[in-house]
Amino acid sequence: MSNQSNNTIPEWILRRLPYNHYNINVDGKNMHVMEKGKGRPIVLVHGNPMWGYLYKKVLDNVNSDKARLIVPDLIGFGFSDKIKIGEHSLEAHTEWMASFFKTIKEESIGLVIHDWGGMIGVAGAMRAGKKIDGLVIMNTSVTAPKDGFTPTWFHSLSQLPVISDLLFRVFNFPLSVLKKF
């Protein structure tokens, strides 16, 4: 584990997310993690195209004496290492999450999952040998999309090579929009 440098995360983000920030190495890639509290570990896994900020209100309102909330940014999202579009697959993300789960000392965890973070989170925890003793499921699936699946316009937009790079890397979308709130 290494502490995330404040130079990497903009100051205005750190003010909104006043938690412990650190990076862990998962198979050669840096995964950014936010953590708050003591007690029972509860891992909150976001979906696509989200990041750990999704759980800000949860982090702000859960009693930190009873729960240790652990919020990783999936590889390629938030403040974790960025990857090429072709590297995003359920299998790759599941392996990265399994490596992440192995860094949690406790055998039993609570798990909050959203979107494709559901499949990635559950499969990663199982591969790491974790016992899931509490589960909150939000807008997810337990299987991969079937043939003929049609992605939303936003998912399609995020797959366009030049346009997605401009939006997400050059214009810092959605961070640039969040600054307005």
Language-model features, listed with the residues they occupy:
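Conserved residues in the N-terminal Rossmann fold of short-chain dehydrogenase/reductase
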Residues: N23, V71, I113
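Conserved HGGG/HGGXW glycine-rich cap/lid loop of the alpha/beta-hydrolase fold
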Residues: H32-F79
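Flexible "cap/lid" subdomain of the alpha/beta-hydrolase fold that forms the substrate-access gate
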Residues: S2-N20, K29-V33, P49, L54, ...
